[in-house]
Structure formats: C-alpha cells, structure tokens
C-alpha cells in the first residue's frame, strides 16, 4: 500500500483502489530517501530511525514522573515567597487566562496560591504527544504490516511492538482524553511544528474515510448483485455472505454516494428495466462479484488491518471527530483547524458515517464553525467538495436524504440537522445570498417536509423548526412592504402639509378658546354643584324607594294574612251549625280529624253518613267510612277520592270493598267520628291505600322508605292524603298518560288491561307524513316537549305579546322553531293540494299553525326584547357609571397630578440636554419608566421615582385612593356599550311601530305599559351614556391625548398598570433596603469571624483537597463561562476573539437557544400581528 498523503479527498479519489495498487513507485522511494530534509516532519507517512529514538527519548520525562499522593501534598512545606511566586506564575502561564482574570488570581493569599500549585502539579500528562502520533503514523505506514524484506525486518518489528496490543480505536480514545483533560501546554506541543499532530490526525481520518467508503461501495455492489440474481432466478437465488462484514455499513450507504451510477441506483431500488434485463445475464454478473471480493487492494487492506490490530473504521472515524472537537476547544487549535482546509473537508465527509450519533456530532461542529468569522465560506467549500466526491447532482442532497428518509428516528440527529441548516442559510450578512441558500434547500424539498413534521411531539425539534421559519425571507412579503412603504411616505407628506394648514387654523381658534375657557370654568363649577345636589337627591330618592318597597311588601303580607283569616272565618261560620248538631264527640278527635274537618268544610256536599247496607245508587254521593275496626291500624275509607273533586265524579271509579254499606242521602245527619282517621298508637303507622288512576302512568324511580324507617323523621308529620283533596289530578293524568287502551275501570284486572293493549297493537297505525328534514323534525320535537304548551295557547300569547303566559325561555325556543320560507312554501303547497292534514305529524301540525301567524318573527323578537330589557339595562348601567366615575375622579385627583409632575421633572432632567425640555407627555410614556434602567441594570427609573416620592412626598404614596373605579373602567369597552345602547334603541323603535300598527284594544295594553315603564329608563341610560362620553372625552383631552380614537379600556388600563407597577416597585425598594441592611450587618460580623472561617476552610481543604482547588477557582470559571452571552447575541465571533472553551460555549448556547437573526424577530412579530388581525376579521365575518 502506498503512502497516504496529507491532503483531502477530492473527486480524483472516487475510486480509492487507484491509490493503493502501486506501492513500489519511484516517487515513494524518493520520498523515503529525502525524509530527513523536512525538519523531522513525516510527510510521506513513514518513520525514520531518528524519529523512533526521538519519541523514546522524549517520553522518558513523562513516564518517570511520580504523582504526589494526598498525604504527601498536605505534608509538603510551603516554599519561600520568591519560589512561590515563580511557581505560581508558571501555573498561570499554563492556564492561559485573560489579564483581568490572571490579576484576580494574583491577589490571592499565599496559602491559596500554594494550594493551586499543588493541585496543578497533581495533574501531569502520562504520555507525550509523540507517543500517540507515532502509533497513528504506524497505522498509516503500509509497510508496517509487511516484513518480507530482510534489511527492514528489525525496524518493522520495532514498529509493531510500538503499536502494542491496543487497537487503533483505543489509541484514539486515549488521545481524545489527553487533548480534553491535559493542560494547554500539552495541546500546544501536540500542535506545534515539531509534532504536527493535526496533520497526522487528519491523514488518519482521511485514510479511514477512504476505507469506509470502499466498504460501503462493496456492500452496495453485493446488494445490487444479489437483487439481480434474485430477479434472474425468479426470486430463488441464494444469499451471498461476506467473510468480514462487521466493519461494512449494512444500511446501504453506498447507494447514497453513487448517484452518478444509474445502474446501481436502479438496482438499489429493486427495479430493472427491460434493456438491463436483456443485456445482463447470470454468467456476466458472477465474475464481477468474484473480482470485487478477490481484488488485491481489498486483501492488502484486510491483511494490514488484521496484523496491526486496527479497530473498525466507523469507530475510528467517530473518535477522530471527537479528537478534532477537543482540539477546536482550544483557541490555537480552533484557528489551526479553520485554516486547515483538509480537516474541514474530512469532517464534512464524515457525514457518510452510518451512525446517526456521529452525523449529529459532525453537524454540530460544522454549525459552530459557521458562527466564526470566515467559517461560513469554508463550510460551503467543504460541501462543494462533498458534492464532487459523492457525485451529488445538487449540493446538500445527501444531507437532505438523511434528514427526510431516515431508517430510524433519532431526535439528536434531527435537531442537529435542522440547527445546521438554519445556521448555514441565515448566518450570512448578504440578504441575496441568504435567499439563494434558502432556495437551495427549498428546491431539495425542505419546506414541504417541514410542513409535514411541524406538529412533531419533540419540543427541541419544534424550537429549531420555529427558529428556521422565523429566519426565512419571504420575498413577496418584502416586495409588498416596500410598495406599502412608498405609499405610506407619500401619505405622510400629504398629512404633513395638511397638518401645517391645520396648525394655522388652530392658531386662529386659540384666541376664541381663551375667551370661552373662562366661561367654561364658570359653567363647570355650577355643573359640579348641581351634580352634587343631584347626587344627594338621588340618594334620598333611593332611600325613599326602598322604604316604599318595604311598605308595599308589608302591606301585601298583611293583605294576604287578612284574606286567609277571612277565609278561615267563613269556613268556621259554615261549619259551626253542622258541628253543633253532631255533639261533642265529633270535636273530641285528634289532629287527623281536625284536618279532615277543615278539608271537608270547603266541599259543597255534606259529610258521609254512618255505614249502611250497599245500594246501587251510591254513585251520586261520597262513600261512607267503614265501621271502626278492632286492630290498632285500621284501613282507610274505601270510597275516599284521591283527587278530592267537589263534584264527586271520580267517586264511581274507586273500587268498593266487598261488604261496603249502602249510602244514605245527602240530607241525613253527619256520621260519628271516623276511626280510620284517628291518630295511630305509638309505634304503629297508618296503612296507606292505593290510589286508583284512569290511565297508565309512568313510574317514578325513587327509593321509598319502609314504615318502620319513617319513625322519627319529617315524613311522620306529613299527610299526603290532604294534598289529594287540594289538587285536581285529572289534568295531571292527561299530561302524563302513556297508555291508549282506555281508562282503568273498577273491577278490571291486569289481564284485561294487557289484553286490550295487546289487541290495540295488532292494528298498524298509518304512517304519518312529515314535510321537515329528519334533523329539523327531531329538534322541533325536542323543543315542543320543552315548550309544554298547546299550540292555541302559544298563538294567543304571541298575538297578545303576553310574557306572563309565554315565558322568556319559551320565546327563545319559539324563535328557533319559526318556519323558514321554504317550510312555509311546502306547507302552503300541501294545503293547496288538499291533502289530509291529519296525516301530518304532531310537529308538522305545530309548524303549520305557526306558519299561519302573521309577522311571527317580529312579534317574537319584540317579546324577547321586552323580556331582556330590564337585564340589559342593569348590565349596561354600571358600566356607564364606572366610566363616568373613573373619568371624573382621574381628572380631579390632586395626588395623581403631583405624581405626573414629578415624572415630568425627572424626564426633563434626563432629556433636556439632548432633546430640550418638554412641557408635558402622553400617559403612554408611563410604561417606559420601567424600561429605563440604571447603570448597573439592577433598578429602573420608576424605582428611583418611587423612592423619591417615599422620601420627599410620602403623602403621594396612596394616590390610587383618589382614583375611583379605574379598575372597573379598564374592563369596559366604551364602543361596545354604545353599540348595546343603540341596540336597545332599535328594539324600542320596533315596539313603538308594533304599538302603532295595532288598533286600540285589549291587546295593546301590554305594549303601552311596557313603553310607559321602559322609555324613561332608556332615556336615562342614554343621558348617562352621553355624560360618560363627555366626561371621558374631557379626561382624555385633559391629559393631552386625542379623544377621536381614544379607547376607554386601553386608557384606564394604562392607569391601572401604572398604579400596580408603582406599588410593586415600592415593595421592591423596601425589600432591597432590608437586604442591604442585612448585608451590611453580615459584613460587619464577617470581619470579626474571619480568623475562625479561615481555619474551617483549611480543615475542609485537608479533607477534600480536590474540591478545594475547584472552590478557589470557582469565581474564575464562572467568569469564563459568562463569555457565552456574547454567543447568544448571535454575532459572528472573530478569529482573534476565539478563547479557550469557545467551541463548547457556542454549542451550549445553541442548545439553550436556537439561532435567530434580529430581523427574524421583527418578521415573526409582524406575522403574529397579521395572523391576529386575520383571525379577528374572520371572527367578525362569522358573527
């Protein structure tokens, strides 16, 4: 194998076998003979004897250094001051700190300096850089694995011993750890001209990339050949198994790198056209596979890898990238890698690695290089080289293939890929170039793919996608903005001219205004006095109205009580003569007898006589109670009617007992007391009888109590028998009946009822006809059940506009049920065709009746308006009053005026030198008091103003106490209130027109009463609204704003925000003062306890020496990490500004916050505003 040159892979290296098939060329021997002329550097990849001796000699100073133990370090005596300063200066030089940080460490005391020296001496390099470089160059030497020549036998054996048992992957891992953990001088020694470590590492990475690409192409050829064999043999071909496939990419990576080979690409997709099937045969394909497997270059590479115990190419490439990352974390190494074009090309070519983790690492490094000045051009050049080597049709084509057509989803790779594309497109300053790069990715399908994955569940990927879309340039939108800007500038010029004319006119009116102002002040004073008098009168009127309402309620209560007493007196006067003839026995019964007597007194029929033999003519009189039974709980009277009907029409339907006595005439004397109605003894319950019904009724699914469970509860005191006499249940049964088989007659059993029901089901009812749609029919049926009123009553209530008969809820239901024009037309056609209306469904009959009502929509709208008028007035009135009150209080507030005066003073003090003094400011400027920060950025201008007011004007701290109702007014939109009042006015006009259309009669008194009661209220609320508008207008103009486009909610919200911010900043000032006092007290105590604290620190250092060194350097490390904030500003870092650890800070900054341009933030805010406007416009159109 020939020597591996220190150069990148170009398009001439597409076939890697050409470089490896001529190992004995004349140039090779010439380079070996002249190897000593290059100052000890090895450019041809071979080692000389003096190089071997140099490595062994140099390594002695590292291998024989003994590491001091913890005990020996603690027992080491502190040297003299001069020696301590000399050694400490050496430690500072190795740390390579900025001057300010080095000065901070030089101010440490001697004890801390000695601790840092001891900790730094503990960290010593185990091996020199040449130890690792000699091994890498041995792996690169093609003759290290061939020892057939006798004169090189001893020298080559020594090189194999130098490699040892460790693999190349392990050597690279050790090198990466050394580069990352050793001090800076070690890294500088690795990169100096003597060792040339970067060149050796890049040469080895290039060598391993060639081998991996060769393995990937071989795997692609094998896969394509296997598919051809399968297609040729009809799918029965066998598999070809490689002897050493562990280091070959199984993912078919070669297919992605061979876009120029159309035949291989077609075979990778599993398809063959007819021409290829005709020309290719099994006998032609077989030798090609044998040549690929038995090629001399492949055998030499395999033998070289096996003899030198080299690791897998994929592992070596990944660890080599990690080594380059560690080098780039050093400021010298970063600049060397940037200037080493072959290194960047090798990093970019590592994207063909099969591991997604390696791809993500490569993309992160490339993205970080783009953020350094001049790095963007280098990265694009590396991808141009990638395009030539991998034979891409377009740049970034392979990267987009990996991004869009992944075999396994890896979130780190997707985020790194999205981050790289965002930075490589949008980190350039030239806008045209940004648009060009943006379109380059758009042509590869990035925009469509981002639209597909924008709803991904990964928050990190969402953030990167959002950052890219925020940075995107929309050229069409920019053109539109440019045209809008031109027209806006023209409009500004016109407005400026118009403003000049208006200023001239305004100066003329100033004189008139001065004359009218004095008169206005006089009128305002009189109006304020009148307003105070009016307020007092309104308060008195309110008190009198409350007293009047209270008296009316008391009068109604007394009237009701008097009416009740009068009814009781009439009842007693009717029952006294009858009860006197019955003797004292009838008055001796308990509570149930008294209740039954009072209930029977309201009936026109006399009480039933004592029991007598049964008579068939007893249907005209109420049945008598049974004779007094012997058991303690007698049954109830058999003929007792549950409905208590005075006419006794239901008495004949009640079942009579088998031995019912006959009824006497209604003129016989009253019977003796009924035993069944006497109170039951203690511990016993009266047995309730079953209530007969005419129809079958639904069942109430309740949980009933047993008689023994009722004892001691409220149900023991209830008597539902009395309710049966007071309620007419006939209508109840008509409303809730579920059977159609007729009434349940006396003496009929369940079998007969069931038979009648079953017989009725045998006859199929004719299907009803409906002119409504299915959904409309169902909605009408549901609304009709909710309505629960006959159609005649509904129509009568609509004609009379009576909200007592038709509730507001039913009116709203009917507004939804109003027939449409199409439905009215269909019903008219149905009637014209003289079809049977009885065949229509109940819902269609209902809708037919509604369609016949004239102007039903207008009438229902009037009823809805009348029903909601009071609520609307009660809702609008407080809003109007809050605006008026807030405007008046804000204008009359003296404390708020003084606060604004202080703010004006501070503003003029800040701006008078630059902009000149100001005579006033708009209230929107109060929000900017928070944004004006102090020098240390810890406090704002409002903090200082609040502190000044507390110190000089403490009486102004509660200025918000004079601002009444500003919180409520901030939540009220005056435009909406005006619109609501206008809607009330329109509704009132409809009521007036309806009253004028109707003739004088009984149906107009409702409208007249409503107009009489509501017009004054509407006039009052309109007057209050005008007063509120005038007060708000005067308030806005009083504070210097224009009242033309003023928004009440925004205006008062500004005042509320200022008052809240004032309180918050006052609390922060107080808390800051408390903390400063506590800090001062702690500082005073710290001086007294300094000796004790130093002893405790020393004890902790002896116990944990390693942690002690970290604690001493904690301040320096934190300051070094603070430089990452410059990365967050998304400004490109100059190459001379790169510091140690800058690469890690850039990567951490990109993970914490994606790359966004300043113009991208403005565009995203503009898009958000446009989207909000569009959504509001759509909502208004929907409404």
UniProtKB/Swiss-Prot annotation:
Residues 23-36 have a biased composition (Basic residues). Disruption phenotype: Lethal; shows planar cell polarity defects with abnormal ommatidial orientation. RNAi-mediated knockdown in the eye results in planar cell polarity defects with ommatidia showing defective rotation. Residues 63-79, 572-584 have a biased composition (Polar residues). Pfam families: Drf_FH3 (PF06367), Drf_GBD (PF06371), FH2 (PF02181). One of its GO terms (biological process) is cell migration. It comes from the Eukaryota. Residues 1-44, 63-82, 572-681 are annotated as: Disordered. The keyword Phosphoprotein applies. GO terms for molecular function: actin filament binding; GTPase binding; small GTPase binding. Keywords: Phosphoprotein. Residues 687-1088 form the FH2 domain. Residues 605-614, 622-640 have a biased composition (Pro residues). Residues 641-654 have a biased composition (Low complexity). Residues 76-559 form the GBD/FH3 domain. The modification Phosphoserine is found at residue 225. SUPFAM superfamilies: ARM repeat (SSF48371), Formin homology 2 domain (FH2 domain) (SSF101447). Residues 1136-1169 form the DAD domain. GO terms for cellular component: cytosol. SMART domains: Drf_FH3, Drf_GBD, FH2. PANTHER family: FORMIN-LIKE PROTEIN. The DAD domain regulates activation via by an autoinhibitory interaction with the GBD/FH3 domain. This autoinhibition is released upon competitive binding of an activated GTPase. The release of DAD allows the FH2 domain to then nucleate and elongate nonbranched actin filaments. Belongs to the formin homology family. Self-associates. Interacts (via GBD/FH3 domain) with Cdc42; the interaction is stronger with the GTP bound form of Cdc42. Together with Cdc42, involved in establishment of planar cell polarity in the developing compound eye by contributing to ommatidial rotation. Together with DAAM and Cdc42, has a role in neuronal development of mushroom bodies. This is Formin-like protein.
């Amino acid at each position: 194998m020939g020597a591996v040159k220190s150069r990148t892979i170009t398009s001439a290296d597409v076939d890697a076998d050409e470089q490896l098939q001529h190992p004995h060329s004349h140039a090779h021997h010439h380079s070996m003979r002249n190897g000593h002329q290059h100052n000890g550097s090895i450019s041809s990849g071979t080692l000389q004897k003096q190089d071997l001796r140099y490595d062994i000699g140099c390594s002695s100073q590292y291998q024989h250094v003994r590491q001091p133990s913890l005990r020996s370090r603690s027992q080491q005596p502190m040297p003299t001051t001069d020696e301590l300063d000399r050694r400490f200066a050496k430690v500072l030089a190795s740390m390579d700190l900025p001057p300010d940080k080095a000065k901070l460490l030089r101010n440490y005391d001697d004890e801390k300096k000695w601790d840092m020296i001891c900790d730094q001496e503990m960290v010593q390099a185990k091996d020199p850089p040449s130890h690792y470089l000699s091994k890498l160059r041995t792996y690169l030497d093609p003759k290290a694995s061939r020892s057939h020549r006798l004169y090189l036998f001893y020298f080559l054996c020594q090189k194999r011993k130098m490699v040892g048992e460790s693999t190349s992957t392990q050597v690279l891992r050790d090198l990466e750890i050394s580069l990352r953990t050793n001090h800076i001088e070690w890294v500088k020694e690795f990169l100096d001209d003597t060792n040339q470590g970067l060149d050796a590492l890049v040469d080895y990475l290039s060598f391993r990339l060639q081998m991996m690409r060769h393995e990937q192409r071989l795997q692609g050829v094998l896969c394509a050949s296997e598919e051809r064999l399968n297609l040729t043999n009809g799918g029965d071909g066998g598999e070809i198994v490689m002897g050493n496939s562990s280091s070959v990419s199984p993912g078919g990576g070669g297919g992605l790198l061979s876009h120029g080979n159309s035949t291989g690409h077609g075979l990778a997709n599993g398809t063959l056209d007819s021409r290829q099937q005709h020309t290719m045969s099994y006998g032609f394909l077989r030798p090609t596979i044998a040549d690929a497997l038995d090629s001399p270059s492949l055998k030499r590479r395999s033998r070289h890898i096996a003899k030198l115990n080299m690791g897998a190419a994929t592992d070596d490439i990944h660890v080599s990238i990690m080594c380059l990352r560690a080098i780039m974390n050093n400021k010298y190494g970063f600049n060397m890698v940037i200037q080493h074009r072959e290194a960047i090309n090798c990093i970019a070519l590592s994207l063909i690695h099969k591991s997604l983790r390696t791809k993500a690492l490569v993309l992160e490094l490339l993205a970080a290089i783009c953020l350094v000045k001049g790095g963007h051009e280098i990265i694009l050049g590396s991808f141009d080289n990638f395009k030539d080597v991998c034979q891409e049709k377009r740049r970034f084509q392979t990267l987009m293939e990996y991004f869009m057509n992944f075999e396994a989803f890896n979130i780190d790779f997707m985020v790194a890929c999205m981050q790289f594309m965002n930075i490589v497109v949008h980190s350039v300053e030239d806008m045209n170039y940004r648009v060009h790069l943006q379109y380059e990715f758009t042509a590869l399908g990035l925009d469509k793919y981002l639209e597909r994955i924008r709803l991904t569940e990964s928050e990190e990927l969402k953030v990167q996608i959002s950052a890219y879309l925020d940075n995107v340039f929309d050229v069409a939108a920019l053109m539109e903005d440019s045209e809008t800007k031109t027209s806006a500038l023209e409009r500004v010029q016109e407005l400026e001219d118009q403003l000049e004319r208006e200023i001239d006119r305004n100066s003329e009116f100033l004189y008139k205004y001065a004359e009218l102002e004095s008169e206005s002040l006089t009128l305002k004073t009189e109006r304020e006095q009148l307003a105070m008098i009016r307020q007092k009168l309104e308060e008195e009127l309110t008190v009198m109205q409350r007293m009047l309402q209270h008296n009316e309620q008391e009068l109604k209560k007394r009237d009701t009580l008097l009416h009740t007493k009068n009814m009781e007196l009439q009842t007693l006067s009717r029952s006294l003569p009858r009860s006197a003839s019955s003797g004292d026995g009838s008055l001796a019964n308990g509570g149930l007898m008294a209740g039954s007597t009072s209930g029977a007194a309201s009936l026109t029929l006399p009480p039933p006589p004592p029991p007598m033999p049964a008579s068939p003519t007893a249907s005209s009189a109420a049945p008598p109670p049974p004779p007094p039974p012997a058991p303690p709980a007698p049954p109830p009277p058999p003929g007792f009617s549950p409905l208590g009907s005075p006419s006794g029409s239901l008495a004949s339907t009640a079942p009579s007992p088998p031995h019912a006595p006959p009824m006497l005439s209604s003129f016989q004397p009253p019977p003796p007391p009924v035993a069944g109605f006497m109170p039951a003894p203690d511990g016993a319950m009266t047995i309730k009888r079953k209530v007969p019904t005419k129809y079958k009724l639904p069942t109430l699914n309740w949980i009933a109590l047993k008689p023994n469970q009722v004892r001691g509860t409220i149900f023991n005191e209830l008597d539902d028998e009395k309710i049966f006499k007071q309620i007419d249940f006939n209508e109840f049964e008509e409303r809730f009946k579920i059977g159609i088989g007729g009434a349940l007659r006396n003496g009929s059993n369940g079998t007969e009822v069931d038979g009648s029901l079953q017989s009725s089901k045998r006859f199929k009812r004719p299907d009803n006809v409906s002119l409504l749609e299915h959904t409309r029919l169902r909605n009408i049926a549901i609304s009709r059940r909710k309505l629960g009123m006959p159609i005649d009553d509904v129509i009568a209530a609509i004609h009379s506009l009576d909200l007592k008969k038709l509730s507001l809820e039913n009116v709203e239901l009917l507004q939804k049920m109003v027939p449409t024009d199409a439905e009215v037309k269909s019903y008219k056609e149905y009637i014209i065709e003289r079809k049977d209306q009885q065949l229509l469904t109940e819902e269609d009959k209902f809708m037919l009746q509604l369609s016949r009502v004239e102007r039903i929509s207008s009438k229902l709208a009037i009823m809805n308006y009348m029903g909601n008028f009071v609520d609307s007035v009660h809702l609008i009135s407080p809003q109007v009053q809050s605006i008026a009150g807030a405007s008046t209080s804000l204008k009359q507030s003296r404390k708020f005026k003084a606060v604004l005066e202080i703010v004006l003073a501070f503003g003029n003090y800040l701006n008078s030198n630059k902009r000149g003094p100001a005579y006033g400011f708009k209230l929107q400027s109060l929000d900017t008091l928070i944004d004006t920060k102090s020098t240390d950025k810890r406090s704002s201008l409002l903090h200082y103003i609040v502190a000044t007011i507390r110190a000089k004007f403490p009486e102004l701290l509660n200025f918000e106490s004079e601002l009444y109702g500003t919180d409520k007014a901030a939540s009220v939109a005056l435009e909406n209130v005006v619109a609501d009042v206008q809607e009330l006015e329109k509704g009132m006009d409809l009521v007036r027109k309806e009253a004028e259309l109707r003739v004088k009669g009984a149906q107009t008194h409702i409208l007249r009463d409503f107009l009489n009661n509501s017009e004054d209220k509407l006039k009052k609320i309109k007057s209050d609204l005008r007063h509120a508008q005038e007060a708000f207008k005067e308030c806005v103009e009083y504070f210097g704003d224009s009242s033309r486009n003023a928004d009440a909610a925004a205006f008062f919200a500004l005042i509320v925000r200022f008052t809240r911010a004032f309180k918050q900043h006052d609390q922060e000032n107080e808390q800051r003062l408390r903390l400063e006092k506590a800090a001062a007290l702690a500082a005073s105590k710290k001086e007294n306890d300094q000796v004790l604290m130093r002893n405790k620190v020393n004890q902790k250092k002896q116990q944990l020496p390693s942690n002690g060194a970290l604690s001493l350097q904690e301040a320096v490390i934190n300051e070094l990490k603070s430089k990452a904030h410059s990365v967050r500003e998304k400004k490109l870092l100059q190459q001379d500004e790169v510091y140690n650890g800058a690469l890690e800070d850039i990567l951490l900054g990109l993970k914490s916050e994606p790359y966004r341009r300043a113009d991208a933030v403005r565009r995203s805010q503009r898009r958000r505003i446009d989207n909000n406007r569009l959504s509001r416009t759509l909502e208004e159109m929907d409404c």
